[in-house]
């Protein structure tokens, strides 16, 4: 279902980002020595500015949530048992339903998952499964090239221009009907050591989410789909709330 509200929110946000773009913001971003290739089509000035804004607005709270994980584990290590939070009693005691699902997520009986490697993406989208969960997390080694090329592969897939030719000359390309894409970004505890903002590593979660959302949301909505995310390894409702705010 085409979401006009989300589309106009994106257009406004992107225009605002471009309006606020300045060299001071970009100078906050540095790259680790291992990040030798820049990937200019992915790491545009506008995209980097978007990552900086995400980092400055949300990373502080993320670090607080990670600190809370340590404190919670210490509490359990002392022999205490988990308990339901008092402040969420109304959720447990009342009747409620989740918001309606988008049309292209109504049937998820057959899904496939794998890393964001180019051939894998093509085969997964052509597999006949209803959903492909493109994984930046466990199944993807987070090297600089894997992360950046994974983003480019997804851009090409969403624009339906992705193809791959192996060493024997066999060409892979998309069928007319393909699976719906869900992105699995890295967990909250994982940093991306290759991108630094003000000298500090950025959250891998924000890199995976930010670059994918920035480059693809307009085309996804045009495709009558949307930016869908599988959020791994959440340990508390406050962490889910953090993602909702992002």
Predicted features along the sequence, with ranges:
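Short, Lys/Arg-enriched N-terminal segments with co-localized hydrophobic residues
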Residues: 1-17
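Conserved alpha/beta-domain cores
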Residues: 21-35, 39-46, 50-56, 85-92, ...
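Hydrophobic alpha-helical membrane-insertion signals
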Residues: 64-65
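N-terminal, Lys/Arg-enriched amphipathic/low-complexity engagement segments
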Residues: 71-94
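N-terminal flexible segment immediately upstream of the FAD-binding catalytic core
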Residues: 97-99
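Internal mixed beta-strand/loop scaffold within catalytic domains of large alpha/beta enzymes
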Residues: 105-112, 119-132, 137, 141
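Hydrophobic or amphipathic alpha-helical targeting/insertion segments
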Residues: 129-167
